[in-house]
Design a protein with these regions (language model features):
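S-adenosyl-L-methionine
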Residues: 1-31
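Flexible loop/turn segments at secondary-structure boundaries
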Residues: 26-27, 45-47, 76-79
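Short, conserved loop/helix-junction motifs that constitute active-site signature segments
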Residues: 31-32, 57-64
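A conserved beta-strand element that flanks and buttresses the S-adenosyl-L-methionine
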Residues: 37-38
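Hydrophobic adenine-recognition pocket in adenosine-nucleotide-binding enzymes
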Residues: 42
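A short, conserved alpha-helix within the catalytic core of class I
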Residues: 45-58
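Conserved beta-strand signature within the Rossmann-like core of class I S-adenosyl-L-methionine
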Residues: 62-78, 84
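Rossmann-like AdoMet/SAM-dependent catalytic core
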Residues: 88-134
Length: 134
Protein backbone atom coordinates (compact mmCIF):
# COMPACT_ATOMS: atom_id res chain seq x y z
CA UNK A 1 0.00 0.00 0.00
CA UNK A 2 1.08 3.53 -0.82
CA UNK A 3 0.01 6.72 0.92
CA UNK A 4 0.67 10.45 1.03
CA UNK A 5 1.34 12.13 4.36
CA UNK A 6 0.06 15.70 4.45
CA UNK A 7 0.94 18.36 7.01
CA UNK A 8 -1.49 16.98 9.60
CA UNK A 9 -0.74 13.33 8.98
CA UNK A 10 1.40 10.76 10.66
CA UNK A 11 2.84 7.52 9.38
CA UNK A 12 0.15 5.02 8.41
CA UNK A 13 1.36 1.64 9.62
CA UNK A 14 -0.73 -0.04 6.92
CA UNK A 15 1.35 1.55 4.14
CA UNK A 16 4.54 0.08 2.76
CA UNK A 17 5.47 3.40 1.11
CA UNK A 18 4.64 6.94 2.21
CA UNK A 19 5.18 10.05 0.10
CA UNK A 20 5.80 13.36 1.83
CA UNK A 21 5.34 16.54 -0.24
CA UNK A 22 8.48 18.70 -0.14
CA UNK A 23 6.73 21.58 1.62
CA UNK A 24 5.88 19.22 4.50
CA UNK A 25 9.40 17.90 5.05
CA UNK A 26 9.27 18.58 8.81
CA UNK A 27 6.86 15.62 9.08
CA UNK A 28 9.93 13.38 8.81
CA UNK A 29 10.65 14.14 12.47
CA UNK A 30 7.21 12.80 13.48
CA UNK A 31 7.05 9.52 11.59
CA UNK A 32 7.89 6.17 13.06
CA UNK A 33 10.92 4.19 12.02
CA UNK A 34 11.70 4.22 8.31
CA UNK A 35 14.28 2.08 6.56
CA UNK A 36 14.62 4.06 3.34
CA UNK A 37 14.31 7.69 2.28
CA UNK A 38 14.37 8.74 -1.40
CA UNK A 39 14.82 12.23 -2.82
CA UNK A 40 14.93 12.79 -6.57
CA UNK A 41 15.44 16.27 -8.04
CA UNK A 42 14.02 18.35 -5.22
CA UNK A 43 16.89 19.05 -2.81
CA UNK A 44 18.45 21.02 -5.65
CA UNK A 45 15.48 23.41 -5.36
CA UNK A 46 15.99 24.14 -1.64
CA UNK A 47 18.19 26.40 0.40
CA UNK A 48 21.00 24.57 2.20
CA UNK A 49 19.55 25.04 5.73
CA UNK A 50 16.39 23.19 4.63
CA UNK A 51 18.45 20.38 3.08
CA UNK A 52 20.42 20.09 6.31
CA UNK A 53 17.15 19.87 8.28
CA UNK A 54 16.04 16.99 6.04
CA UNK A 55 19.20 15.08 6.85
CA UNK A 56 18.95 15.92 10.54
CA UNK A 57 15.38 14.57 10.66
CA UNK A 58 16.41 11.42 8.75
CA UNK A 59 19.30 10.85 11.16
CA UNK A 60 16.91 10.71 14.12
CA UNK A 61 17.64 7.71 16.33
CA UNK A 62 14.18 6.23 15.59
CA UNK A 63 15.30 5.51 12.04
CA UNK A 64 18.42 3.55 13.08
CA UNK A 65 20.83 4.51 10.26
CA UNK A 66 18.36 4.48 7.36
CA UNK A 67 19.30 4.13 3.72
CA UNK A 68 19.05 7.40 1.80
CA UNK A 69 18.90 7.52 -2.00
CA UNK A 70 19.63 11.03 -3.25
CA UNK A 71 19.55 11.97 -6.95
CA UNK A 72 20.11 15.69 -7.60
CA UNK A 73 22.20 18.10 -9.65
CA UNK A 74 25.84 18.52 -8.69
CA UNK A 75 25.16 22.25 -8.45
CA UNK A 76 22.34 24.61 -9.32
CA UNK A 77 21.87 28.36 -9.22
CA UNK A 78 18.68 29.16 -7.31
CA UNK A 79 16.27 31.98 -8.28
CA UNK A 80 17.68 34.20 -5.50
CA UNK A 81 21.17 33.88 -7.02
CA UNK A 82 22.47 31.42 -4.43
CA UNK A 83 24.05 28.14 -5.47
CA UNK A 84 23.18 24.76 -3.96
CA UNK A 85 25.82 22.01 -4.23
CA UNK A 86 25.39 18.26 -3.74
CA UNK A 87 28.63 18.02 -1.76
CA UNK A 88 27.29 20.51 0.80
CA UNK A 89 24.14 18.53 1.69
CA UNK A 90 25.27 17.58 5.18
CA UNK A 91 26.92 14.26 4.46
CA UNK A 92 29.11 12.99 7.30
CA UNK A 93 32.39 11.10 7.25
CA UNK A 94 30.82 8.35 9.38
CA UNK A 95 28.03 7.68 6.84
CA UNK A 96 28.41 4.40 4.94
CA UNK A 97 28.39 5.03 1.18
CA UNK A 98 27.07 2.22 -1.03
CA UNK A 99 27.61 4.20 -4.24
CA UNK A 100 28.19 7.82 -5.23
CA UNK A 101 28.45 8.56 -8.94
CA UNK A 102 27.00 10.37 -11.93
CA UNK A 103 23.50 9.20 -12.71
CA UNK A 104 23.34 7.87 -16.27
CA UNK A 105 19.56 7.49 -16.38
CA UNK A 106 18.74 11.12 -15.47
CA UNK A 107 20.88 13.57 -17.43
CA UNK A 108 18.22 14.95 -19.80
CA UNK A 109 14.60 16.04 -19.66
CA UNK A 110 11.86 16.27 -22.30
CA UNK A 111 11.04 19.56 -23.97
CA UNK A 112 7.86 20.21 -25.90
CA UNK A 113 8.70 22.80 -28.57
CA UNK A 114 10.37 21.55 -30.61
CA UNK A 115 9.81 18.09 -29.22
CA UNK A 116 12.97 16.38 -28.04
CA UNK A 117 15.37 16.17 -25.14
CA UNK A 118 17.45 18.80 -23.39
CA UNK A 119 20.46 18.34 -21.12
CA UNK A 120 20.34 19.73 -17.59
CA UNK A 121 22.74 22.64 -17.03
CA UNK A 122 24.68 20.55 -14.49
CA UNK A 123 25.26 16.80 -14.32
CA UNK A 124 23.03 14.76 -12.03
CA UNK A 125 24.66 12.73 -9.29
CA UNK A 126 23.20 9.96 -7.20
CA UNK A 127 24.23 8.52 -3.90
CA UNK A 128 23.00 5.62 -1.80
CA UNK A 129 24.18 5.92 1.77
CA UNK A 130 23.44 4.63 5.25
CA UNK A 131 23.03 7.79 7.32
CA UNK A 132 24.74 7.38 10.67
CA UNK A 133 22.18 8.15 13.37
CA UNK A 134 24.65 8.43 16.24
Amino acid sequence: RVGVIDEGGVNNNNNNINFIPAENYSIIQKIKQQDLFINIASMQEMDLPIVNNYLRFMRDERHNSPLFYCCNRISKRLPDGGVICFDDYGWRADDTIIFDELCEWYQRYPKTVPFGWRDFDSPIRYKLVYLNSR
